[in-house]
Curated annotation (Swiss-Prot):
One of its GO terms (cellular component) is plasma membrane. The lineage of its organism: Bacteria, Pseudomonadati, Pseudomonadota, Betaproteobacteria, Burkholderiales. The keyword Iron-sulfur does not apply. Pathway: Porphyrin-containing compound metabolism; heme O biosynthesis; heme O from protoheme: step 1/1. It is found in: Cell inner membrane. Converts heme B (protoheme IX) to heme O by substitution of the vinyl group on carbon 2 of heme B porphyrin ring with a hydroxyethyl farnesyl side group. Keywords: Cell inner membrane, Cell membrane, Heme biosynthesis, Membrane, Transferase, Transmembrane, Transmembrane helix. It is an enzyme of class 2 (transferase). Its EC number is 2.5.1.141. It comes from Leptothrix cholodnii (strain ATCC 51168 / LMG 8142 / SP-6). GO terms for biological process: heme O biosynthetic process. It is a multi-pass membrane protein. This is Protoheme IX farnesyltransferase. The chain crosses the membrane at residues 29-49, 55-75, 101-121, 123-143, 151-171, 177-197, 219-241, 246-268, 283-303. It catalyses: heme b + (2E,6E)-farnesyl diphosphate + H2O = Fe(II)-heme o + diphosphate.
Length: 305
C-alpha cells in the first residue's frame, strides 16, 4: 500500500518543482496585463468570437511566458544558489537538472508558439517569441550581469504583454497598444529598484551589477523618485490619446501621487521596511491602474448606448 502512495507523492513533488520554474506570480501579472490589452482592443462587450480568440491568446502567452521564466532559472542556476531570495528554486537546489529545465522550457515555448500562430495570428506569435528572446536571452544573459541599466533596457521585453494582447485581438500594433507598453516600461525601474534596495547584499553576493550595488543606496532612491514623476506623466497618455475618460484620469492621478509619496519618503528617510512597502505598492499601482482603465473603457461604452 505504501509503494503507490510514495510514487504518487514523488510525482506530485516533481510536478510542483516544474510549476515553481515558471514563476507563477510573475507570470500571473504578465497574463493579467496581456488580458487588459485584449479587452481594451475590443470596442464594447466582447462577443463569443472575441472571447474565444482571447482565451487562445491568453493560453499561448501564458505558455511562452512560463517558458521564459523556466529558461531564466536555467541560465541563472548558479546565481540563484547564491541569493537568499532565489536559493529555493528547483534548479538552484539541484532538484531539476539543466537538461530537464531546458526541455521543459522548449516544450512550453513550442506549444505556446503553435497556439498563437494557429489560433490567434502570426503577428502575435512573432511578437511573443521576440519577447521571449528579449527576456530570456538579451536581458538574462547579456544585460543583467553586465550593466546597472539592465532593468531599464531589459524592461522593453517586460513591457510587452499589453501590446501582445492588443495585437492578438486587432492583428496590428496600434498607438494604443504602444501606450500601454510605455506605461509598463516606465513603471519597471522604480518597481525593481525598490526590490534591489533591500536585496542589495543578495545581488552583490551574486555578482550582479544592480543599481544599489554599483551606484549606492542614495543614488538609487533618487532615481526611483524621478521615475515616479515620469511614470505619472506617462499614465496620463491614455486620456490624452482618447483611450479613456475622467474616471481613469482620476485613478491615474491618485495612484501616481501615492507612488510618488512612497518614493519621496524612501528618498528622505530610507528603511528596509519602507523599501519593501514601496515595492509591494508598485505591484498594486500597476494592477489597479490597468483595472481602472478597463472599468473606464466599459463605462464609456455604457454611456454611449
Amino acid at each position: 500500500m505504501n509503494a503507490p502512495s510514495s510514487a504518487a507523492g514523488h510525482v506530485s513533488s516533481h510536478w510542483r518543482q516544474y510549476v515553481a520554474l515558471t514563476k507563477p506570480r510573475v507570470v500571473q501579472l504578465i497574463v493579467f496585463c496581456a488580458a487588459i490589452g485584449m479587452l481594451l482592443a475590443v470596442p464594447g462587450a466582447p462577443g463569443l468570437a472575441d472571447l474565444g480568440k482571447a482565451l487562445w491568446a491568453t493560453l499561448g502567452i501564458w505558455l511562452v511566458a512560463s517558458a521564459a521564466a523556466a529558461f531564466n532559472c536555467l541560465i541563472e542556476q548558479q546565481i540563484d544558489s547564491r541569493m537568499k531570495r532565489t536559493a529555493w528554486r528547483p534548479t538552484a537546489r539541484g532538484e531539476l537538472s539543466r537538461t530537464q529545465a531546458l526541455i521543459f522550457s522548449a516544450v512550453l515555448c513550442s506549444a505556446g508558439m503553435a497556439v498563437l500562430h494557429e489560433a490567434v495570428n502570426p503577428l502575435t506569435a512573432w511578437l511573443t517569441l521576440g519577447t521571449f528572446v528579449g527576456y530570456a536571452v538579451i536581458y538574462t544573459v547579456v544585460l543583467k550581469p553586465l550593466t546597472p541599466q539592465n532593468i531599464v533596457i531589459g524592461g522593453i521585453s517586460g513591457a510587452m504583454p499589453p501590446l501582445l494582447g492588443w495585437a492578438a485581438m486587432t492583428g496590428e500594433v496600434g498607438p494604443e497598444g504602444l501606450i500601454l507598453c510605455l506605461i509598463i516600461f516606465l513603471w519597471t525601474p522604480p518597481h525593481f529598484w525598490a526590490l534591489a534596495l533591500y536585496r542589495a547584499e543578495d545581488y552583490a553576493r551574486a555578482g550582479l551589477p544592480m543599481l544599489p550595488v554599483t551606484h549606492g543606496n542614495e543614488f538609487t532612491r533618487l532615481q526611483i523618485l524621478l521615475y515616479t514623476f515620469v511614470l505619472l506623466a506617462g499614465t496620463l497618455l491614455p486620456f490624452v490619446q482618447g483611450m479613456s475618460g475622467w474616471l481613469y484620469l482620476a485613478a491615474a492621478f491618485v495612484l501616481g501621487l501615492r507612488f510618488i509619496h512612497y518614493a519621496w519618503r524612501l528618498w528622505r528617510n530610507y528603511s528596509e521596511a519602507l523599501a519593501r512597502q514601496t515595492f509591494r505598492f508598485s505591484i498594486w499601482h500597476l494592477s489597479l491602474l490597468f483595472a481602472a482603465l478597463l472599468v473606464d473603457h466599459y463605462t464609456q461604452d455604457l454611456l454611449t448606448l
